[in-house]
Amino acid sequence: MRTVVQQVREASVSIGGELHSSIGTGLLVLAGISRDDTADDLAWMSRKIPNLRIFEDEKGKMNRSLKDIGGALLVVSQFTLYADASRGNRPGFSESAPPELARVLFDRFVESIRHEAGCPVETGVFGADMQVSLVNDGPVTIILESPKKP
C-alpha cells in the first residue's frame, strides 16, 4: 500500500461540482492499493498515519500527531499512485489492484483508520471523478509505503 499524506489547513472533495466531503486542520491521505496488498498492509498504514509526528509543537518542532492536535482525516482512493512510467510516455498501472479488489481493500482501510485514529474521517467516492482541493500547511507531504513482504 502506498499513500501520500499531506498536512492541511483544509481539504475537500467535490464530485460533479457538488461538495461531497471536507475537513479543517488535519491530513489529506491519497491511498493507492497494490495488487499484492493484504490486511497486514492496511493495518500497518492505519496505525502509522494517525501517529505520524508531523505537526509542530510549541517549539516549532515536528513532534505532534494528528491524535495530539485533534485533527481530521480526508481519505481519497488514488490508483495512479502505482503508475509506472519507466518505459514510454504512457503510464501503466499493472501494479495497482484490480478495481473490485481495490474497492474492498480501500473500504477496509477506511474502517481500520477510523478505528485507529479516533477522529473524524471523511472520504471521497471510490472510482469517481473527484476534484480534490487543499490548503497544504507547511508544506508537509510524506510518502509512505507499507513494508515489503519477504
Swiss-Prot record:
The entry sums up its family as follows: Belongs to the DTD family.
The family database entries (PANTHER family) matched by this protein are listed as: D-AMINOACYL-TRNA DEACYLASE 1, D-TYROSYL-TRNA TYR DEACYLASE
Which HAMAP family does the UniProt record give?
Answer: Deacylase_Dtd
Supply the EC number(s). Answer: 3.1.1.96
Subunit text: Homodimer.
* Name by which UniProt lists this protein: D-aminoacyl-tRNA deacylase
Alphabetically sorted, this entry's keywords are:
Cytoplasm, Hydrolase, RNA-binding, tRNA-binding
Catalysed reaction, written as an equation: glycyl-tRNA(Ala) + H2O = tRNA(Ala) + glycine + H(+); a D-aminoacyl-tRNA + H2O = a tRNA + a D-alpha-amino acid + H(+)
Please provide one cellular component term from the Gene Ontology annotations of this protein: cytoplasm
Q: What class of enzyme is it?
A: hydrolase
Report the GO molecular function annotations: D-tyrosyl-tRNA(Tyr) deacylase activity; Gly-tRNA(Ala) deacylase activity; Ser(Gly)-tRNA(Ala) hydrolase activity; tRNA binding
Q: Summarize the protein's role.
A: An aminoacyl-tRNA editing enzyme that deacylates mischarged D-aminoacyl-tRNAs. Also deacylates mischarged glycyl-tRNA(Ala), protecting cells against glycine mischarging by AlaRS. Acts via tRNA-based rather than protein-based catalysis; rejects L-amino acids rather than detecting D-amino acids in the active site. By recycling D-aminoacyl-tRNA to D-amino acids and free tRNA molecules, this enzyme counteracts the toxicity associated with the formation of D-aminoacyl-tRNA entities in vivo and helps enforce protein L-homochirality.
Among the record's GO biological process terms, what is one?
A: D-amino acid catabolic process
In terms of domain of life, where is this protein from? Bacteria
Q: What taxonomic ancestry is recorded?
A: Bacteria, Pseudomonadati, Chlorobiota, Chlorobiia, Chlorobiales
Q: Where is this motif: Gly-cisPro motif, important for rejection of L-amino acids?
A: 138-139
Q: Short name of one Pfam family for this protein?
A: Tyr_Deacylase
Q: Which InterPro entries match?
A: Daa-tRNA_deacyls_DTD, DTD-like_sf
Localization recorded for this chain is:
Cytoplasm
Q: What is known of its domains?
A: A Gly-cisPro motif from one monomer fits into the active site of the other monomer to allow specific chiral rejection of L-amino acids.
